[in-house]
Amino acid sequence: KDEKIEELTDQLKRQMAEFDNYRKRTEKEKASMYVIGARDIVEKMLPIVDSFERGLATVSDSEDPFAQGMEKVYKQLMTAFDELGVKPIEAVGQEFNPDLHNAVMHVEDENAGENVIVEEFQKGYTYKDFVVRHSMVKVAN
């Protein structure tokens, strides 16, 4: 009788441990799905950020009310990105890192160090610890 109680107790403990592992695994999967979904949304919004930056770069009259309004909307968008954990990748002056940067050009430059980024063509971004878009850069050899 004691043997049967011990066996059933052991089975119950195993079942509880198995269920606990299942719960932890599903929580982890759910969190991962959220990050993947958010990353996809951020990726789809990056061309909008690029358009804002290109448009604002062409404005010569900073007193123009329309340009000021667009600047405010851009800043609001970038603040929201920052609060969500979306960060621009530092590029110019940094050492080339293939995990963060995509080298599209190489240049011989004695003034720049070996494998140092001298120009950024398109800004890259990370969301949490994931690269959403690599920076497109020119690297010195």
Q: What are these language model-derived features?
A:
Residues 51-141:
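Structured alpha/beta interaction-core segments
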Residues 1-53:
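Charge-rich, N-proximal long alpha-helical rod segments
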